């Protein structure tokens, strides 16, 4: 039986980021070549049905997969200039519509938070975190992080996904330009376990 945590939650985003970096390294041209990352999404299970055979009912783990992809796109924004999510409504989508009713899936919330909070310049960040190893990947940091800075608002946004399915991780946030002495706001997507 497949281990969903290892094969999808950890491996798929790590592989995607590795492929983006490999594409950048293989470009030995004097011109920049950019990537459009098309039709990405969390799609881990398929439910049978009469109408929507490709429909997904997402859980917290899927929302965290979406957040990891958004972190990847911020970290690699020098090369990934466009990233199109596969499907936005109903089939493998963050929103579902049934007649005149709309409901938001778990994968909607990371999209909402990134779209409404991440502005300005993506920051190059350094992460020191406990790590996880799979058969294919060694030393995958449990903390998956991206950050942005909006100079006009003097605002730093830090996006963190804890990949550890069993433990909370305490982290220190340090800045090379001084301490953070302003008000901070936290938006948290969380649950008792990832399969909710």
What are the residue ranges of the model-derived segments?
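Generic recognition of flexible, low-complexity loop/linker segments
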Residues: 22-25, 69-72, 82, 133-134, ...
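Conserved, mostly hydrophobic/aromatic
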Residues: 16, 39, 83, 111, ...
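Catalytic cores of secreted or luminal carbohydrate-active enzymes
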Residues: 70-87, 92-141
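Noncatalytic carbohydrate-binding groove/subsite architecture in carbohydrate-active enzymes
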Residues: 1-69, 127-139
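Generic beta-strand/beta-sheet core signal
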Residues: 36-45, 85-88, 98, 159-163, ...
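Secondary-structure transition/capping motifs at alpha-helix termini
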Residues: 19-31, 72-81, 117, 178-180
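Flexible loop/turn segments at secondary-structure boundaries
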Residues: 41-47, 89-95, 133-134, 165-168, ...
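Carbohydrate-binding surface patches
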Residues: 140-180, 186
């Amino acid at each position: 039986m497949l281990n969903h945590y290892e094969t999808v939650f950890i491996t798929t985003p790590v592989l995607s980021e590795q492929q983006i970096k490999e594409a950048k390294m293989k470009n030995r041209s004097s011109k920049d070549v950019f990537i459009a990352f098309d039709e990405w999404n969390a799609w881990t299970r398929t439910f049978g049905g009469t109408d929507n055979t490709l429909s997904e009912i997402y859980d917290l783990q899927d929302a965290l997969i979406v957040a990891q992809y958004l972190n990847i796109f911020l970290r690699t924004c020098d090369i990934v200039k466009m990233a199109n999510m596969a499907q936005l409504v109903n089939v493998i989508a963050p929103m579902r519509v049934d007649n005149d009713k709309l409901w938001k899936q778990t994968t909607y919330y990371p999209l909402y938070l990134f779209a409404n909070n991440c502005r300005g310049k993506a920051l190059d960040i350094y992460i020191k975190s406990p790590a996880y190893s799979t058969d294919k990947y060694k030393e995958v940091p449990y903390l998956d992080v991206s950050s942005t800075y909006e100079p006009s608002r003097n605002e730093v946004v830090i996006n963190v996904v804890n990949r550890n399915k069993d433990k909370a991780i305490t982290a220190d946030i340090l800045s090379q330009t001084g301490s953070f002495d302003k008000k901070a706001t936290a938006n948290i997507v969380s649950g008792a376990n990832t399969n909710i």
